[in-house]
Amino acid sequence: MSQFFEAATPVAIPTNNTNGGSSDAGSAATGGAPVVGTTAQPTINHRLLLSLKEAAKIIGTKGSTISRIRAANSVKIGISEKVPGCSDRILSCAGNVINVANAIGDIVDVLNKRNPENEDAAEGEAEEHYYFHFLNHILPAPSKDEIRDLQQLEDIGYVRLIVANSHISSIIGKAGATIKSLINKHGVKIVASKDFLPASDERIIEIQGFPGSITNVLIEISEIILSDVDVRFSTERSYFPHLKKSSGEPTSPSTSSNTRIELKIPELYVGAIIGRGMNRIKNLKTFTKTNIVVERKDDDDKDENFRKFIITSKFPKNVKLAESMLLKNLNTEIEKRENYKRKLEAAEGDATVVTERSDSASFLEEKEEPQKNHDNKEEQS
């Protein structure tokens, strides 16, 4: 029996949205409105692989479409620069988990919409075969047997979510249990690419379904990624849009054509610099357009109190910017902890003074009591 695509049922989330998330964000989710964002949600940064045409559609005339999505969902959203000879671009969307999921639901809805004045071009675009095979859909197009309302067939869309390989196994689950649960619960189709994106440790998770259903499944995927504590933040390389199809082995992020800087960060501050779920370091890499590798610690490592950060890029100014921002983050964290330590010491000092005063008062009371007894005896005599 064929699986039916299902309309999304909004997750019950409090609506005290002080982040500026708008209910308009859910208007795109045909087949069910996405949930409304809240300030209690942790943050995440999702990256999507786009073709050039998809990127142009999301940007819109003079950036109007992407600006609307950004404002409606209170997220940071951007698309990598268009490079001559490159067939793909990367969309990054950062913010709290629910707002990011809502924004991506809006993106799916934008990609689903066809220009009624140019139906032939839209049909050709849907059937386009890309030379860069990661842009070609892994999942087959939805059939009429997989949907209850044929009028909603065109509302089913896709996203190509870029995910670090270390998270893929958690999303799939033991014997595929987790991914099967997501598919059945949200009425979507999900598949992971077998191949790694060029020169990276990332793969594609393709999701097919209604925009609202994709929104809700992304919330659960985000929670899986954020709770995936057994991740080695390490040497995983992020994918950046290729210039040409690789003819051999993936190129190393530290080739001779790249500018390279190594920094030693105290082990005590590494977790804070990387951020929860590697969000902080990922945002830094995206903003500076660099590759940053955090080396794993070896048992025989002599510098056991430090971790090596390696920054590489083809552009020296980008490497310098990343180095400057990384050191600034380190100094901010050091200062933050020093301030906390001083406040803690001051509070302990105040507590000591109070204790000493209390002890002194008790001593004086004890000293005065015998004196009173002595005076009473003299009066009686």
From Swiss-Prot:
Residues 369-381 have a biased composition (Basic and acidic residues). The modification Phosphoserine is found at residues 358, 360, 362. Pfam families: KH_1. Residues 43-107, 156-221, 258-326 form the KH domain. Gene3D superfamilies: K Homology domain, type 1. Its main location: cytoplasm. Phosphorylated by the plasma membrane-Anchored casein kinase YCK1. Phosphorylation at its C-terminus reduces its RNA-binding capacity. GO terms for cellular component: chromosome, telomeric region; nucleus; P-body. It comes from the Eukaryota. GO terms for molecular function: RNA binding. Transmembrane segments: none annotated. It is found in: Cytoplasm; Cytoplasm, P-body; Nucleus; Chromosome, Telomere. Residues 1-34, 344-381 are annotated as: Disordered. Binds RNA. Belongs to the HEK2 family. This is Heterogeneous nuclear rnp K-like protein 2. It comes from Saccharomyces cerevisiae (strain JAY291) (Baker's yeast).
